[in-house]
């Protein structure tokens, strides 16, 4: 009992250092394309590091997961993030960070353009670039076919369409309307467009692996278009696309601590 009293007194006096604000921050973290959110997934080490630091974390399975393969459009994905935010607030989170890896990072940016009140956005190895040749040229025929289906009133008809993930290709089953939404080279998933449209006053952390193709595009591709903020940070770490969340874990924890 005496030891408990001493500890409480020390806490009250500020002698014992604890991350008092950590539990106030809730983080929605979104997995990459064809991925999942479990402990052994590419984002697992990062979400675990966030929890260890005292943050409340929600890492939902999203419409682009291995098992779902674009079963909802972009607005539907944002609604699922809304649900995750609600869960975090129900657990006591007062400030909300939205982040992700690869396509998850892309959608975190889209969310930041359409929702108010975020405390920050974290993107690690941002990916899915439908405006660039690596995706645009590969999906061109299927995109044109899907767009014609939409024009012909068959937008809700499901079919097989090609998808690309870091050079790997596979067919996905999706409705024509949803496929067009995700693959549109002039649409919402164009990263530079999202960054330029982020809400002022929301800081952005961008972390990319040196071996990732995105790193070669540099800050000018998208990051430099973000609204100015003293906490904006662009970090290049070791590694490539898939292992960026693991390598970024301490960078993200430190950045959140500084907010």
Locate the predicted segments by residue.
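Accessory cap/linker subdomain of secreted extracellular hydrolases
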Residues: 124-194
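Sec/Tat signal peptide C-region and signal peptidase I cleavage site
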Residues: 16-22
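Primarily recognizes the serine-hydrolase "nucleophile elbow" in alpha/beta-hydrolase
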Residues: 87, 95-145
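Short, surface-exposed "cap/lid" segments of acyl-processing enzymes
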Residues: 25-50, 62-63
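Short beta-strand/loop motif that positions the catalytic acidic residue
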Residues: 198-200, 206-208
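Alpha/beta-hydrolase active-site loop
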Residues: 71-91
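Catalytic active-site module of serine/aspartate enzymes centered on a nucleophile-bearing elbow/loop
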Residues: 235-259
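Conserved alpha/beta-hydrolase "acid-adjacent" motif
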Residues: 213-219, 244
């Amino acid at each position: 009992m005496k030891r408990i009293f001493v500890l409480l007194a020390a806490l009250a006096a500020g002698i014992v250092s604890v991350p008092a604000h950590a539990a106030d921050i809730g983080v929605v973290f979104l997995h990459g394309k064809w991925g999942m959110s479990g402990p052994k997934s590419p984002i697992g080490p990062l979400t675990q590091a966030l929890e260890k630091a005292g943050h409340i974390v929600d890492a939902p399975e999203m419409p682009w997961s291995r098992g779902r393969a674009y079963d909802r459009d972009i607005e539907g994905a944002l609604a699922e993030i809304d649900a995750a935010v609600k869960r975090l607030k129900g657990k006591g989170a007062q400030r909300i960070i939205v982040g992700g890896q690869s396509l998850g990072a892309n959608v975190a940016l889209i969310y930041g353009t359409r929702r108010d009140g975020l405390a920050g956005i974290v993107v690690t190895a941002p990916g899915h670039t439908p405006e660039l040749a690596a995706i645009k040229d590969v999906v061109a025929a299927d995109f044109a076919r899907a767009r014609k289906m939409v024009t012909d009133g068959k937008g809700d008809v499901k079919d097989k369409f090609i998808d690309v993930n870091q050079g790997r290709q596979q067919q996905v089953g999706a409705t024509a309307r949803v496929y067009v939404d995700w693959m549109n080279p002039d649409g919402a998933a164009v990263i530079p467009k999202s960054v330029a449209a982020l809400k002022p006053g929301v800081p952005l952390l961008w972390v990319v692996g040196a071996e990732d193709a995105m790193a070669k595009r540099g800050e000018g591709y998208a990051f430099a278009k973000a609204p100015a903020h003293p906490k904006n940070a662009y970090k290049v770490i070791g590694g490539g696309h898939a292992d960026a969340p693991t390598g970024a874990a301490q960078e993200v924890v430190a950045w959140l601590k500084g907010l």
